[in-house]
Regions:
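Short beta-strand segments enriched in small/hydrophobic residues
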Residues: 16-18, 54-69, 170, 177-185
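Short beta->alpha junction loops
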Residues: 94-101, 185
């Protein structure tokens, strides 16, 4: 079944079918939309993502890089990204780095070799010239949670400074005088650095 078959069965042009498949319902009447929808349901037609990506010169793949997939935080990121992309054309490609900067570079290079349209990265490194270079080359990169020293990427994160200060204030109100902070190494992790600095302030 092709787009031409759907157009003939619906009594409309291929342009109208293309508009329907691209969600441009504002360019057709409700009756036309229902008729096309019915024909597609009966025929079992599935548009070719590969053909569409070739036409638009996009892969419709989005690389999702997590630093440690065993972490509950990484699980939340993967679920959230999957939910956000569910009603879009994009297909997420997930990779794990095991908190290893060398593996992160390898995995990102792998994703780029597969032609992903962009990257969402929970980076392993506070100092990351590899990602900085990618952004300078025009690769769309959005950071998740951890930022990179000295560079302003688009980022989705938490206000860790404010969170720690609120936590300490709450503990003080509850009568706890000398709280302690236990952490993994923080020298190359922006989130841990922020928490430590807020704790020491």
């Amino acid at each position: 079944v092709t787009i031409t078959d759907i157009a003939k069965a619906s009594g409309v042009s291929k342009t109208t079918i293309s508009r329907y498949l691209n969600g441009r319902f504002d360019l057709m009447s409700p009756e036309t939309r229902r008729r096309i929808e019915s024909v597609i349901d009966v025929s079992g037609y599935q548009p070719s993502t590969i053909a569409r990506s070739l036409k638009n010169k996009r892969s419709l793949l989005l690389g999702i890089v997590v630093s440690d997939q065993s972490s509950p935080f990484s699980t939340a990121v993967l679920l959230g990204v999957g939910d956000a992309l569910r009603n879009t054309e994009y297909v997420p490609v997930f990779v794990n780095c095991d908190d290893d900067p060398a593996k992160e570079r390898y995995q990102i290079s792998f994703l780029l070799s597969r032609g992903v349209d962009g990257l969402i990265v929970n980076t392993t490194s506070y100092e990351n010239p590899f990602l900085v270079n990618l952004e300078a080359r025009g690769v769309p990169v959005v950071l998740c949670d951890r930022y990179i020293k000295g560079h302003t990427f688009d980022i989705v994160t938490t206000d860790h400074d404010s969170t720690i200060r609120q936590l300490l204030a709450h503990l003080k109100e509850q009568g706890y005088g000398l709280p302690a902070l236990f952490s993994q190494r923080w020298d190359n992790n922006s989130v841990r650095l922020q928490r430590r600095q807020a704790f020491a302030a």
